Amino acid sequence: MESQRNILLIGLLFVSFLLWQQWQTDQAPQPVAMESSSTIPSSSTSDSHSSDVPDADSALPAAVVASKELITVNTDQLIIKINPIGGDIVYSALVEHKLELDKDEPFVLLEQTKDINYIAQSGLIGRNGIDSSSKGRAHFDSASREYTLASGQDTLEVPLTFVADNGATYTKMFVFHRGQFKVDVDYVIDNSTDQQLQVQMYGQIKHSIKQSESSMMMPTYRGAAFSTANTRYEKYSFDDMADKNLDEKTLGGWAAMLQHYFVSAWVPPANDQNIIFSSISAGGQANIGFRGAVYDVAPGATQTINSEFYVGPKNQEALSAISESLNLVVDYGFLWWLAVPIYKLLMFFQSLVTNWGLAIILITLTVRGMLYPLTKAQYTSMAKMRNLQPKLAEMKERFGDDRQKMGQAMMELYKKEKVNPMGGCLPILLQMPIFIALYWVLLESVELRHAPFMLWITDLSVQDPYYVMPILMGISMFVMQKMQPMAPTMDPMQQKMMQWMPVVFTVFFLWFPAGLVLYWLVGNLVAITQQKIIYAGLAKKGLK
């Protein structure tokens, strides 16, 4: 009886977790001195707010130039298109990440079309800024309309130049790196005038407000996030932006837009005082970004202002190399402290077997093996409780409706027989955080996207196309249930729920990613094996 109740408890806990997650989804110092002593940043960021940053929505018809006028950059990882008006990144395709498994079309992250506006904008504002809401955007010149990272070339520089009316030259330099999704976006200001110039860099990500494509089975997040010196990682949804504009002063920091598996992020200099801001523009665009330190450029001096932009998959190693907290966009929730070592172990197994399906099997075997002592304690406790059932039934007849005497007698019996009535469910409660953490690792790991296993499973991140594994998983649950016959004293309602549990779980898992179903199926098979071994050992001790 205790075994069925515990299986029922697992089911209820898991379904409750999914429902809770879906509810969560729905509510869902001074800058350092520069190289030139005649060119210094101001002691603080500007007191102005994000209204200083130009609103691209109002200039959208002018900004969306013909495709032939865009500057195209090709690297081994990225296809980038830059608008010469402002130098905004208006298109990014990830070469090695396909849109669909059976097509050669690359996954497009940033794009600017009639229906979608998801771009990375940056510029210079302030007294002598070349981009502002009043002056409009700078029109840059480029030596070429197409740049390609050649074989044997590790970096590719794409310079855009603009000469202001006062004679000062502004160069917007994009630097691309082989094997990376990071782009260095730097401004070089050559002040050939006899007046001091004052500029402030900003970078923002503009995103059409769009509902998340998550479901109860795949609770993913689409929206913004940011980091400050005091807050390493915090989501800031489109609803949050509509309620309140973000305005956080910080040393360093970053601002990002997230979706399942992919992220775009602006990372300003870590040693500069920056302001992380957000807004909802008149055209219904969600914006999040940074405004950096104000720089004073003396006559005859040259100043470089740095920033980094990441546009690509949520690869933890690549993200950590840019900012120590940027890898937190791979969000494992409140059990991150368990999920991180599980992820590292999964990566280790993948390096050994070079197959993500086999790696999932190995980590499932490892986790189940580590939890075996708890599992054994659970079944031992349940066996002892079953042996006490005749005595408990006798007590029930003896004391009738006198619950106080019945409870006292039960406690004395448990103490005498050295049985913990909670011993059957406590191990399950201890195991659930590990199972949930592993669930999140498999759900959040971009490495599983389009990763094949074997036979008909060509993508572990999507559902089994023929529903074979969910059905096998349901059968394994049915076998586990039958290995422990239902006690006649079990409540009729519990019996009905137990009988339908394999069916309910099978229906749930029909739409789960194949990697998650594989984990659960292998876990059930291991549990069946462990159960047979434990029962054999208990039988030798006279426990049934």
Swiss-Prot record:
<dbReference type="InterPro" id="IPR028053">
    <property type="entry name" value="Membr_insert_YidC_N"/>
</dbReference>
<keyword id="KW-0653">Protein transport</keyword>
<dbReference type="InterPro" id="IPR019998">
    <property type="entry name" value="Membr_insert_YidC"/>
</dbReference>
<keyword id="KW-0143">Chaperone</keyword>
<feature type="compositionally biased region" description="Low complexity">
    <location>
        <begin position="36"/>
        <end position="48"/>
    </location>
</feature>
<keyword id="KW-1003">Cell membrane</keyword>
<keyword id="KW-0813">Transport</keyword>
<feature type="transmembrane region" description="Helical">
    <location>
        <begin position="503"/>
        <end position="523"/>
    </location>
</feature>
<dbReference type="GO" id="GO:0005886">
    <property type="term" value="C:plasma membrane"/>
</dbReference>
<dbReference type="InterPro" id="IPR047196">
    <property type="entry name" value="YidC_ALB_C"/>
</dbReference>
<keyword id="KW-0997">Cell inner membrane</keyword>
<feature type="transmembrane region" description="Helical">
    <location>
        <begin position="460"/>
        <end position="480"/>
    </location>
</feature>
<feature type="region of interest" description="Disordered">
    <location>
        <begin position="30"/>
        <end position="56"/>
    </location>
</feature>
<feature type="transmembrane region" description="Helical">
    <location>
        <begin position="6"/>
        <end position="26"/>
    </location>
</feature>
<dbReference type="InterPro" id="IPR038221">
    <property type="entry name" value="YidC_periplasmic_sf"/>
</dbReference>
<dbReference type="GO" id="GO:0015031">
    <property type="term" value="P:protein transport"/>
</dbReference>
<dbReference type="Pfam" id="PF14849">
    <property type="entry name" value="YidC_periplas"/>
</dbReference>
<dbReference type="GO" id="GO:0051205">
    <property type="term" value="P:protein insertion into membrane"/>
</dbReference>
<dbReference type="InterPro" id="IPR028055">
    <property type="entry name" value="YidC/Oxa/ALB_C"/>
</dbReference>
<comment type="subunit">
    <text>Interacts with the Sec translocase complex via SecD. Specifically interacts with transmembrane segments of nascent integral membrane proteins during membrane integration.</text>
</comment>
<comment type="function">
    <text>Required for the insertion and/or proper folding and/or complex formation of integral membrane proteins into the membrane. Involved in integration of membrane proteins that insert both dependently and independently of the Sec translocase complex, as well as at least some lipoproteins. Aids folding of multispanning membrane proteins.</text>
</comment>
<keyword id="KW-0472">Membrane</keyword>
<keyword id="KW-1133">Transmembrane helix</keyword>
<keyword id="KW-0812">Transmembrane</keyword>
<dbReference type="Pfam" id="PF02096">
    <property type="entry name" value="60KD_IMP"/>
</dbReference>
<dbReference type="GO" id="GO:0032977">
    <property type="term" value="F:membrane insertase activity"/>
</dbReference>
<feature type="transmembrane region" description="Helical">
    <location>
        <begin position="423"/>
        <end position="443"/>
    </location>
</feature>
<comment type="similarity">
    <text>Belongs to the OXA1/ALB3/YidC family. Type 1 subfamily.</text>
</comment>
<feature type="transmembrane region" description="Helical">
    <location>
        <begin position="345"/>
        <end position="365"/>
    </location>
</feature>
<dbReference type="InterPro" id="IPR001708">
    <property type="entry name" value="YidC/ALB3/OXA1/COX18"/>
</dbReference>
<protein>
    <recommendedName>
        <fullName>Membrane protein insertase YidC</fullName>
    </recommendedName>
</protein>
